[in-house]
Every structure is written in C-alpha cells, then in structure tokens.
UniProtKB/Swiss-Prot annotation:
It is found in: Cell inner membrane. This is Cell division protein FtsB. The gene is ftsB. Keywords: Cell cycle, Cell division, Cell inner membrane, Cell membrane, Coiled coil, Membrane, Transmembrane, Transmembrane helix. Belongs to the FtsB family.
Length: 110
C-alpha cells in the first residue's frame, strides 16, 4: 500500500512539473502577462503623445493662434505697437557674459 501511495505521489509531482516550470507553464504565462501589461502602458503613453501632436498639427494648419504663439515664445517676436517686458529673477545669475565695447583710439591729426 505504501508503494502505491509513493508511486501516485511521484506521478502527481511529474504531472505538476510541466504545469509550473514547462514551456507553457504558469510561470511563463505570468511573465508574458507582465510583458503585455508593460506594452499596453507604453502604447497608451504613445497614443496620448500622438493625440497631442495631432492637435498641434491641426492648430498649425487651421489657425494663426498656434503660429503666433510659437513666434512669440520660440523666436521672441512681438506685434506692432506692443511693448515687450521681461522680468528677471534677481537671485538668478545671468548666463550671459557681458563684454565691454572695444576702446577706440582717437585718430592722429596731420
């Protein structure tokens, strides 16, 4: 009787091995599920990015508002009869190096 129980236990273990550790086992399925979740998350991020880019393209094609905004912020352009005011942070050091103008020596009289 003991021999039969041991044989049955061994058979159960042999049957369970491919279920858990085999090519199509539960561990592999779990790993693939994690990969699918990561891919879906990345796809959602890319869809959001594409939607944002598509709306920007539509704005540039149809209206002048987006073009005007880009001209203002990226190129520093202003409209006619507009006053440009720039507020600087007093605590932030300027990244520009000021160079004094060159000295001009007076011409000699002849």
């Amino acid at each position: 009787m003991r021999l039969i129980i041991l044989c049955l236990a061994a058979l159960v273990l042999l049957i369970q091995f491919p279920l858990w550790l085999g090519k199509g086992g539960w561990l592999r399925v779990w790993d693939l599920d994690q990969q699918v979740i990561a891919a879906q998350k990345k796809n959602d991020e890319l869809r959001a990015r594409n939607a944002k880019l598509n709306s920007e393209v539509q704005d540039l094609k149809e209206g002048t508002g987006a073009v005007e905004e880009r001209a203002r912020y990226e190129l520093g352009m202003i409209k006619e009869n507009e006053i440009f005011v720039q507020v600087l942070d007093p605590n932030k050091k300027s990244s520009f190096v000021s160079i004094p103008p060159p000295k001009i020596e007076p011409k000699e009289k002849r």
